[in-house]
Amino acid sequence: MHLSSPALPIGGFSYSQGLEAAIELGLVHDEASTLAWIESQLVTVMARAEAPLWCLLFEAWRAGDDAAAHGWNQWFHASRETRELRQETEQMGRSLARLAQELGWGTAATRAAVAALRPATLPAVHACACAMWALPREAGLGAYVFSWLENQVAAAIKGVPLGQMAGQRMLERLRAGLPAVLADARARAGATPPRLDTFAPQYAMVSARHETQFSRLFRS
């Protein structure tokens, strides 16, 4: 619960991951189009790459395989197709790593392994924190994905804008699809080799356009 809290001081509230640009372009303009956009990102960008990658990182940290964890961390960083997306995961990963260091999570050796990530990405540090706390993989993965969902809905409420009740309706709909998304992510991570798919051209183009958008509330 701590790791999925919106009060976690890692700056998630300042990012929309392309949603603000989709609003500017008219792709997202009301509750229905917002729900369609977030669902699309959930079942493609999140379920096919970021969530299974989180599972692989978690298993590597839990097994004490720092080399594998560092390798998957680099893979994720390389998969971020725009400068904003790279800067987002770097900043949030760095902030979470600093929090883990300040609060003394895990062992000194594990904290040193996290500090050695260059750069530290958010899924790598989040998965490590869950492994440090000996959380079940399913609980940690669920917290990670639901935190992403909440952030997307919060960004939509500010950016479209939408009312609080619309936000809660969307969360209710999106939450209902989470079990299937998490199951897909686990299956992809468990395949040999892992089935990771980062093909999302519209997402990348919208994110790139946001970098030069004239008026912005969010950093991505």
Swiss-Prot record:
Q: Which domain of life is it from?
A: Bacteria
Identify the keywords attached in UniProt to this record, alphabetized.
Chaperone, Cytoplasm, Nickel insertion
User: What Pfam families does the record tag this protein with?
Assistant: UreF
Q: Where in the cell is it found?
A: Cytoplasm
Of the GO CC terms on this record, one is: cytoplasm
Q: Can you provide one Gene Ontology molecular function annotated for this UniProt record?
A: nickel cation binding
InterPro entries, per database record: UreF, UreF_sf
Protein family: Belongs to the UreF family.
Known function: Required for maturation of urease via the functional incorporation of the urease nickel metallocenter.
Q: Assembly and interactions?
A: UreD, UreF and UreG form a complex that acts as a GTP-hydrolysis-dependent molecular chaperone, activating the urease apoprotein by helping to assemble the nickel containing metallocenter of UreC. The UreE protein probably delivers the nickel.
Q: What is this protein called?
A: Urease accessory protein UreF
**Which gene carries the instructions for this protein?**
ureF
